[in-house]
């Protein structure tokens, strides 16, 4: 199985951040190791109309080789002296260039059997820069993604408001070649037609490279509650709309089921591995909830071991 592309580039001013310095516990592989975890939100334009969050799960001061980790140093600097759009204004906010990858966060809400999977921009290098080194506003390079993807579903969506668009579902891969579900959209008419014409399905997956821009906007609306007396109550509701908007694709898709790309057997294996991962997530969630409620842990979720039949991939 070839190495698959999964890269992002995020540039702009720090909108706000939630970074914390922590120490690994006694049951970890390296107990007592300091690390930083949390999120940096980047405003890619002066109006802060597109705010892209990047998550950091574990950033230690050094690599396993003992070499200093510059990403840790940069995140530490943000914690101690970083300025944000929220507290200091756009002009004074710290400028950054981030190089995360597309990832997902899998979790099971307590008491529910269905996994929740949300997209996440994860990890990568962090560089604190000067304003003159940023790409111009409007440049797609400020919020770009590029991924190799196996497409298995393309659906035309007609919303109640706004123009029709096409939704593209598939899987991409992390640096370990683990499968990551991804949902993208195409709003350009030519792009929409291109993806619909692929006739991609679970029995006829299409393996290709796509790229585009990460659009993360916040939509505000008001809910008015009338009162029998006195003034009505007005609540502001903020809804986040996140899109991976495709702006380009390879002219010719990769060949599928070949040794030089990915074979049907390899695809079946990575999909099976994801089922095992989700079973482990469920097991950990159940054990955590049980310990939190001071009850005995429920039986561990069984990992999926059945093979995925060729030509009928279980996405």
Regions found by a protein language model. Name each.
Residues 1-315:
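OB-fold and OB-like single-stranded nucleic-acid-recognition modules
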């Amino acid at each position: 199985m070839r190495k698959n592309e999964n890269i992002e580039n995020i540039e702009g001013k720090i909108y706000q951040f939630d970074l914390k310095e922590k120490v690994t516990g006694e049951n970890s592989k390296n107990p007592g190791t300091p690390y930083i975890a949390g999120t940096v939100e980047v405003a890619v334009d002066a109006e802060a109309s597109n705010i892209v969050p990047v998550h950091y799960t574990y950033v230690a001061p050094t690599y396993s080789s003992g070499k200093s980790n510059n990403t840790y140093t940069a995140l530490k600097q943000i914690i101690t002296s970083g300025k944000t759009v929220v507290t200091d204004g756009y002009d004074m906010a710290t400028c950054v260039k981030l190089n995360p990858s597309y990832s997902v966060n899998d979790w099971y809400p307590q008491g529910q059997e269905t996994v929740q999977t949300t997209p996440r921009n994860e990890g990568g290098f962090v560089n604190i820069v000067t304003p003159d080194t940023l790409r111009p506003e409007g440049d797609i390079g400020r919020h770009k993604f590029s991924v190799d993807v196996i497409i298995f579903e393309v659906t035309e969506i007609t919303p109640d408001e706004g123009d029709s668009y096409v939704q593209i579902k598939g899987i991409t891969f992390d640096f370990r070649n683990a499968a990551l579900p991804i949902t993208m959209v195409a709003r350009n008419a030519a792009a929409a037609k291109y993806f619909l014409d692929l006739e991609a399905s679970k029995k006829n997956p299409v393996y290709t490279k796509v790229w585009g821009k990460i659009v993360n906007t916040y939509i505000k609306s008001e809910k008015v509650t009338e009162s029998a007396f006195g003034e009505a109550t007005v609540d502001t509701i903020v809804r986040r709309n996140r899109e991976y908007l495709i702006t380009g694709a390879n002219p010719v898709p990769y060949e599928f089921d070949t040794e030089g790309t990915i074979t049907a057997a390899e695809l079946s294996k990575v999909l099976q591995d994801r089922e095992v991962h989700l079973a482990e997530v469920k097991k950990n969630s159940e054990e955590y909830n049980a310990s939190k409620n001071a009850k005995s842990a429920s039986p561990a979720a069984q990992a999926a071991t059945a093979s995925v039949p060729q030509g009928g991939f279980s996405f």
